[in-house]
Swiss-Prot record:
GO terms for cellular component: small ribosomal subunit. It comes from Polaromonas sp. (strain JS666 / ATCC BAA-500). HAMAP family: Ribosomal_uS5_B. This is Small ribosomal subunit protein uS5. NCBIfam families: rpsE_bact. Keywords: Ribonucleoprotein, Ribosomal protein, RNA-binding, rRNA-binding.
């Protein structure tokens, strides 16, 4: 039989991805004998060039929960098209009671966004953006709403391809 070595939790894969932990919550499961304490971690992972993923992990210990969240974030990565360090056009997204609005910004503006949205933008490589959140400030819902908005963005070439026209005809 082959022997398997246990991978230590400090061995992060060297794949060039940026990782950010957004939140760690203490959670409780109530059972007949009392309460079982655990932890839930929310993380985002990105390559700095438009790919970003989010993950949530739960465990009895914080490091294990963070590790599970990072692994899930790596599995759930999506590609978002960027234009000179910002997005192509205004986009809106929502998840639950969280609503987010994002607008492209000129070079040098920086990331004008709060809380969990800023972490998503930093790991995916956006350098200039203006973003506003309304409604729920729950970190999980805000990250999901941000991902929803980013997935709703399209490029001019994608719109032209859908319409069967050239990019020049679209901008007229």
């Amino acid at each position: 039989m082959a022997k398997f070595q246990a991978k230590s939790q400090n061995d992060a894969p060297d794949d060039g991805l940026k990782e950010k932990m957004i939140a760690v919550n203490r959670v409780t499961k109530v059972v007949k004998g009392g309460r079982i304490l655990g932890f839930a971690a929310l993380t985002v992972v990105g390559d700095g060039d438009g790919r970003v993923g989010m993950g949530k992990g739960k465990s009895k210990e914080v490091p294990a929960a963070v590790q599970k969240a990072m692994e899930e974030a790596r599995r759930n990565m999506t590609k978002v098209s960027l234009k000179n360090g910002t997005i192509h056009h205004n986009v809106f997204g929502h998840w639950g009671a969280a609503n987010v609005m994002m607008a492209p910004a000129p070079k040098g503006t920086g990331i004008i966004a709060g809380g969990p949205m800023r972490a998503v933008f930093e790991v995916m490589g956006i350098t200039d953006i203006v973003a506003k959140s309304h409604g729920s400030s729950n970190p999980y819902n805000m990250v999901r709403a941000t991902m929803d908005a980013l997935n709703n963005s399209t490029t001019a070439s994608e719109i032209a391809a859908k319409r069967g026209k050239s990019v020049e005809e679209i901008f007229g």
